[in-house]
């Protein structure tokens, strides 16, 4: 995710939720953290801009 991207709250929720599911199923964690809950790990990764997700918007 680049700094120039601004996500709506719905996009942010979808990104964090998708990443939390990946972490819950054993995907490697992309940041150093003491958290054990997948949703909290995903939120930390989102805040650290460590997620390799791309949002495609139709019509833009």
Swiss-Prot record:
Keywords: Cytoplasm, DNA-directed RNA polymerase, Nucleotidyltransferase, Transcription, Transferase. It is an enzyme of class 2 (transferase). The keyword DNA-binding does not apply. Gene3D superfamilies: 3.90.940.10. Its EC number is 2.7.7.6. PROSITE patterns: RNA_POL_K_14KD (PS01111). GO terms for cellular component: cytoplasm; DNA-directed RNA polymerase complex. It is found in: Cytoplasm. It catalyses: RNA(n) + a ribonucleoside 5'-triphosphate = RNA(n+1) + diphosphate. InterPro entries: DNA-dir_RNA_polK_14-18kDa_CS, Pol_omega/Rpo6/RPB6, RPB6/omega-like_sf, Rpo6/Rpb6. Pfam families: RNA_pol_Rpb6 (PF01192). Part of the RNA polymerase complex. DNA-dependent RNA polymerase (RNAP) catalyzes the transcription of DNA into RNA using the four ribonucleoside triphosphates as substrates. Belongs to the archaeal Rpo6/eukaryotic RPB6 RNA polymerase subunit family. This is DNA-directed RNA polymerase subunit Rpo6. The gene is rpo6.
């Amino acid at each position: 995710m680049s700094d120039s991207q601004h996500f709506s709250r719905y996009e942010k929720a979808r990104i964090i939720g998708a990443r939390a599911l990946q972490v819950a199923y054993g995907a490697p964690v992309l940041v150093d953290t003491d958290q054990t809950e997948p949703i909290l790990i995903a939120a930390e990764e989102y805040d650290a801009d460590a997620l390799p997700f791309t949002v495609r918007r139709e019509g833009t």
